[in-house]
Amino acid sequence: MDYNLDPSIAALIGYAFGSIPFGLLLTRMAGMGDVRSIGSGNIGATNVLRTGNKGLAALTLVLDLVKGFVPVWIAWRYFQNDIGWAALGAVVGHCFPIWLGFKGGKGVATNAGVCFGLGWGIGLAYAFVWLVMLAITRISSVAGMSAVVAAAGAAWYFGRPTFVPPLVIIAVIIIWLHRANIRRLLRGEEPRVGNKP
């Protein structure tokens, strides 16, 4: 059954899911305190990994993927005309959760869930580019930024032009949130995976 829904409502549904701060909740439940007080101060899986608990970081990653996927799936199932805006809402919710003073994560994992929700081709392109760029550069931020740009191109390639504007907005947001990483890249100071900063 399909309904017509105002795009802003679809975006709010996405935001509600995306703004669940799994990284913060899991680290607190595990007795590790506030993950925002370490590393980058973000609530995503990469910063949770800095606690030294790989299992907790992996669980955060999975749940961040799920919270991107679920609102897009709901939009596919019930609101066929508002899928892209549910996707945008989910990433915005993760990056700027109202409950945490609009300071969340950088959105790469949540956007992966979003992309798989938008279509397997888009999701696989996202994952492929992320993995290839990580293998080549061993720099997580480069892999993430490359993947978000590739997602918009993949949406166009797979015949989903209505998904391109939300994915472009998402790419701009995520790249902007990586501005400190970009500055370190330009200085040659961005840490590589497997190396201590």
From Swiss-Prot:
Q: Which reaction does it catalyse?
A: an acyl phosphate + sn-glycerol 3-phosphate = a 1-acyl-sn-glycero-3-phosphate + phosphate
Q: Specify whether Metal-binding is a keyword of the entry.
A: no
List localization entries.
Answer: Cell inner membrane
Q: How does it sit in the membrane?
A: Multi-pass membrane protein
Q: Name one Pfam family in it.
A: G3P_acyltransf
Q: Where is the signal peptide?
A: none
Any idea what this protein is called? Glycerol-3-phosphate acyltransferase
The organism's taxonomy opens as: Bacteria, Pseudomonadati, Pseudomonadota, Alphaproteobacteria, Sphingomonadales
